[in-house]
Amino acid sequence: MERRKHNTQDYKILALDVATHCGWALDKTIYGVWNLTPKRDESAGMRLIRFRSKLKEVITSEHINLVVFERPGGRHVGAVIVQSELQGQVKVICEDLNIPYRGYSSQEIKKFATGKGNVGKPAMIAAAKQKLNYTGDNDNEADAIWLLELAKSEYK
């Protein structure tokens, strides 16, 4: 997506921390986690089906017109594969619906939130509590909220 400055009032943004426990945020106070874990007798593809369903539901019901997500990364190959599959779903759905999307690296999000690009999950949660009045304890939610704030700062 072309990087341009926009007024965030033009956008209804959905931020996604794509993973099996997928953090999402629409606002500093409207956020959550989708548990996409396949059940015992299901194939791994059910994670993608659940994700597609939830993503389409939120995009249509909330009139989303910009989706931002954390790009896959890390040392755990299995997690990177899952993140890549989910990111692919985001891109396909957004392309189908003609909705712009943007990926951010973990380091970009962490640096925006804390000033350092290599902090751990507890530091991201603590920064969200201190700076954004976040009341939860879930790193997936905190990451999604920070991602939303980063996108808002870029698209003002």
Feature roles, as predicted:
Residues 1-156:
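Phosphate- and other anionic-substrate recognition elements at nucleic-acid/protein interfaces
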